[in-house]
Amino acid sequence: MAKSQIWFGFALLALLLVSAVADDVVVLTDDSFEKEVGKDKGALVEFYAPWCGHCKKLAPEYEKLGASFKKAKSVLIAKVDCDEQKSVCTKYGVSGYPTIQWFPKGSLEPQKYEGPRNAEALAEYVNKEGGTNVKLAAVPQNVVVLTPDNFDEIVLDQNKDVLVEFYAPWCGHCKSLAPTYEKVATVFKQEEGVVIANLDADAHKALGEKYGVSGFPTLKFFPKDNKAGHDYDGGRDLDDFVSFINEKSGTSRDSKGQLTSKAGIVESLDALVKELVAASEDEKKAVLSRIEEEASTLKGSTTRYGKLYLKLAKSYIEKGSDYASKETERLGRVLGKSISPVKADELTLKRNILTTFVASS
């Protein structure tokens, strides 16, 4: 197979993966609004602004609603960013945020939702208007809850990098951060060496004082090699947190929790793979020995990657030069299906490393 076809396959797979992990709340734009709304299903639409405090407070409730109704074929749960999509917001008379409107099936004439802004009330409203009987889904919590009983065991574990939010239940900024912080925990839930945690420092004042907490929320990072901890002073968007953890922990996740194309790549072994592919049949065993030697020097999480490089190099020698491209194709097909996150990680690492074999052929 030509290299261009292989790289096209990678790009297509990436698009499939992004679609598979898209938010349960459908994002609408000026261009897509009337292609989705007013058709064969009723639609509940939140018109919001990213800077709006009430919108931030509503966000986790609305996401819970979206998760619950995602399989309901007769109902759409959607949202519009009115900072970006001014035309459609103006058209439907939006003058404050958040504005929630219900569009009946086959109609672009909305009725404004005036009820409580929580998932339970919204679900009751949608079920009534949409003729559905959907129960609210339980939303998994991936943020580790700390207490005085487990704080030292979790935070001071020298095998883990731990990000801790010290918060107070009454703190408005903490409430605004909560949905983003939960997403951060979800992104890194497959990483054994990373923990995203929080502590109610209002209820557990002694721990807050011990770590110099004087305002809420306070975020502190406790890396494996510095359990005194230090303040996190970065941005508070999802991408900011993900970039920080990737840099500090050596992980390679995107904001959807998928491994990036850099995951598993070891530069020194990549260089040896290129030599292996270019080597004559008589020279390949000598290069394989060097790969084995280099892999044995790796430490920490890279030890796993070294073993995978060695295994794939042996398969490349045993099965022939077309092994890498055929195996890459097969992995692409499997990754395009519904598989567990653990399996997806395993196959993505393998595919990433095989990319060097393919590119060097």
Curated annotation (Swiss-Prot):
InterPro entries attached to this UniProt entry: ERp29_C, ERp29_C_sf, PDI, PDI_thioredoxin-like_dom, Thioredoxin-like_sf, Thioredoxin_CS, Thioredoxin_domain
Cellular localisation: Endoplasmic reticulum
Leader sequence segment: 1-22
Catalytic activity of the protein: Catalyzes the rearrangement of -S-S- bonds in proteins
Disrupted-gene phenotype: Smaller siliques and reduced seed set. Disrupted pollen tube guidance.
Enzyme Commission number(s) from the entry: 5.3.4.1
Keyword set, alphabetical order: Disulfide bond, Endoplasmic reticulum, Isomerase, Redox-active center, Repeat, Signal
Residues the record marks as site: Lowers pKa of C-terminal Cys of first active site: R117
Pfam families named in the record: ERp29, Thioredoxin
GO CC annotations on file: cytosol; endoplasmic reticulum; plant-type cell wall; plant-type vacuole; secretory vesicle
Tissues in which the UniProt entry reports expression: Widely expressed.
Swiss-Prot/TrEMBL site (Lowers pKa of C-terminal Cys of second active site) positions: R236
Active site: C52, C55, C171, C174
Domain Thioredoxin: 23-131, 132-250
Superkingdom of the organism of origin: Eukaryota
MF terms (GO), sorted A to Z: protein disulfide isomerase activity
Disulfide-bond pairs as recorded: C52-C55, C171-C174
Induction record: By chemically-induced ER stress response.
One of the GO BP terms on file: embryo sac development
Site location (Contributes to redox potential value): G53, H54, G172, H173
Family per similarity comment: Belongs to the protein disulfide isomerase family.
Function of the protein: Protein disulfide isomerase that may be required for proper pollen development, ovule fertilization and embryo development.
Database matches in PANTHER family: PROTEIN DISULFIDE-ISOMERASE C17H9.14C-RELATED, PROTEIN DISULFIDE-ISOMERASE LIKE 2-1
Protein name: Protein disulfide-isomerase like 2-1
